[in-house]
Structures are given as C-alpha cells and as structure tokens.
Amino acid sequence: MPQLSRYSDERVEELLTELASVLSKHKAPTDLSLMVLGNMVTNVINNSVAPAQRKTLARSFAEALQSSIRDDNAH
C-alpha cells in the first residue's frame, strides 16, 4: 500500500532532480553516491530528530528503503 505524503510529488521530484544533478556534476560513482547520501541521512537524523526517536526512525527508513528496491534487472 503506497504511503501518503504531506509533500507533493512535484516537490519531491524537484529535490531528487537537484540531488542527482549534483552527483552527476561531480561524476560520483555509485559507491560514492551511496556513501554521501547515507551520510546525509545520518546527518539529518542526528541533527533533526530527538535522540529517543533516532533508532526507530532509522529502522523505519531502512525498512522503507528495502521495500522500495526492485528485483528486476533494470539499471
């Protein structure tokens, strides 16, 4: 079941496009891109979420990431 978001698809896509553009501009390979994005997620959680909620949010984020990964062969 899709999650409802308080943010519009347009706003999400705009941010995604900008982030992808920065990674492309720096010719970041997949491993570096994942490292940087992972560090960004960690930074957001550590600086914007109450300490008591961090582990729960990180677990939920990881589960959402796992559920969004496709099993097909597309690149």
Swiss-Prot record:
On the tree of life, the source organism's domain of life is Bacteria
| Signal peptide residues on this chain, from the entry's feature table | none
Pfam families xref list: DUF1414 (PF07208)
In terms of InterPro entries, this protein maps to:
UPF0352 (IPR009857), YejL_sf (IPR023202)
The parts of the chain that form a coiled coil are: none
Family as reported in the entry's similarity comment: Belongs to the UPF0352 family.
Name of this protein: UPF0352 protein ESA_01049
Task: Record the organism.
Answer: Cronobacter sakazakii (strain ATCC BAA-894)
